[in-house]
């Protein structure tokens, strides 16, 4: 990939956002995006809190994974006690794959909604303004910037090493 030295177009972003309302207070929303990544997908991973009482040794990795694109599906992943006398945990996954013949292209749904005057899937003005506020912070240069950007040379994979180190801390399910 050839990018001019003068380019200020972000090609790789990893960050944590917080929603400023009572419902989502303190809940991190982690964003990972970039060009030429190993694979493209849109998914939501909800990592459930560990119970306050730890009955068994090992990590608790209970989570709900909602894949929107490609191949929409839902995974509920939880650590359960293995059968037998020991106190080992094993990962159990409940998966639901949505039939591909019922899948609808995103633009089909938007056109259908537009024809039926349903605005619920369209971005509202306040969402657009907030998106631009975040992007403007990413494009900021100088000492007054709220977000630190790091120049890097693209070498493939998930992006520069500092991005890989950053997302490793997310405990993202493979």
Residue ranges and their predicted role:
Residues 4-174:
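Secretory/organelle targeting and membrane-embedding segments
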């Amino acid at each position: 990939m050839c990018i001019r030295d003068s380019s200020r177009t972000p090609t790789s972003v990893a960050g944590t956002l917080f929603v400023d309302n009572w419902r989502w207070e303190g809940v991190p929303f982690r964003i990972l995006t970039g060009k030429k990544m190993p694979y493209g997908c849109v998914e939501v991973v909800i990592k459930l809190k560990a119970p306050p009482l730890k009955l068994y040794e090992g990590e608790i990795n209970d989570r709900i994974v909602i894949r929107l694109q490609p191949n929409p599906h839902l995974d509920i992943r939880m650590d359960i006690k293995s059968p037998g006398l020991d106190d080992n945990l094993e990962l159990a996954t409940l998966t639901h794959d949505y039939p591909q013949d019922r899948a609808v292209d995103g633009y089909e749904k938007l056109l259908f909604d537009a024809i039926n005057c349903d605005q619920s899937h369209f971005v509202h003005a306040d969402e657009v303004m907030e998106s631009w506020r975040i992007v403007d912070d990413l494009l900021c240069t100088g000492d007054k910037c709220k977000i630190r950007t790091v120049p890097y040379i693209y070498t493939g994979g998930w992006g520069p090493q500092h991005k890989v180190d950053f997302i490793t801390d997310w405990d993202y399910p493979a």
